[in-house]
């Protein structure tokens, strides 16, 4: 039996908690940064703010709290599930006093830190090492809409860690008849796939919003995985990881699925709506690709990696080009070998 604290009560954190709660051998706690959200989940038996319509059955052992100290003192395994721009603050300002050498951490956040271009596991490691802690750390990646995981739809994802024993433990913790985990030791590749696919999903949405057709979508996905792979490999990831669940799998889902917030942002941009208006309409939910684009381009520039699709997504997000102008630019670039 594992004592698990899911730290983050957004859609993805709640879905993970619901999935794990179906396996009765775990003791499980869901932490929310918002006392109001925690109280709402307790009162209504579902997360009406971020994952409405997916009840927490009373028979399932999910304890919801806004008390970080209680959550971390309870936990053996910490599952870190919060927006990328909240990770450093959460670990430095909220979690740090309660972290101990006995903790093991799984990061389920996809993104890059704005100022440093660090992956989420690197951000967490940076905070831990400053406190003299070197904890087992793993990352979760792959095609996994929160709503479908919460509903128990068959899903396959990847867990990556340099600690093979911890990866194997997580594989056992998560795997059941509806969710299959593959293990990997390419932490960089898995995280880069999860972060970069959100940028390409915005581009795919733009194509849909402009009404440009399926050929254009296929081109964006295919050339998108090429530039994702270039940057991931330059950072130390493996090419084959980007061809797996954490790269191509997550990219296809996020570029084509109607539940993708990043794709939705692109669709609405393609239709002519302004970015601020689109983001306001997400109801507090986060489209990570909007923030990740600038960080990915900064990282790519530092490594001499060309990312033309990401660059055009950035110009559209910044209001420097219209969606149609960005697509026309991509189609008029000089010819090259594939």
Curated annotation (Swiss-Prot):
Residues that bind NADPH, according to the entry? 12, 33, 110, 146, 261, 286, 288
Q: Which UniProt keywords apply?
A: Cytoplasm, Lipid biosynthesis, Lipid metabolism, NAD, NADP, Nucleotide-binding, Oxidoreductase, Phospholipid biosynthesis, Phospholipid metabolism
**This protein's superkingdom?**
Bacteria
Cite the EC number: 1.1.1.94
An example Gene Ontology molecular-function term: NAD binding
Q: Which SUPFAM superfamilies match?
A: 6-phosphogluconate dehydrogenase C-terminal domain-like, NAD(P)-binding Rossmann-fold domains
Entry-linked InterPro entries? 6-PGluconate_DH-like_C_sf, 6PGD_dom2, G3P_DH_NAD-dep, G3P_DH_NAD-dep_C, G3P_DH_NAD-dep_N, NAD(P)-bd_dom_sf
| Catalysed reactions, as listed in the record | sn-glycerol 3-phosphate + NAD(+) = dihydroxyacetone phosphate + NADH + H(+); sn-glycerol 3-phosphate + NADP(+) = dihydroxyacetone phosphate + NADPH + H(+)
- HAMAP family in the cross-refs: NAD_Glyc3P_dehydrog (MF_00394)
Q: What does this protein do?
A: Catalyzes the reduction of the glycolytic intermediate dihydroxyacetone phosphate (DHAP) to sn-glycerol 3-phosphate (G3P), the key precursor for phospholipid synthesis.
Q: Which PANTHER family match?
A: GLYCEROL-3-PHOSPHATE DEHYDROGENASE (PTHR11728), GLYCEROL-3-PHOSPHATE DEHYDROGENASE [NAD(+)] 2, CHLOROPLASTIC (PTHR11728:SF1)
Could you identify this protein by its name? Glycerol-3-phosphate dehydrogenase [NAD(P)+]
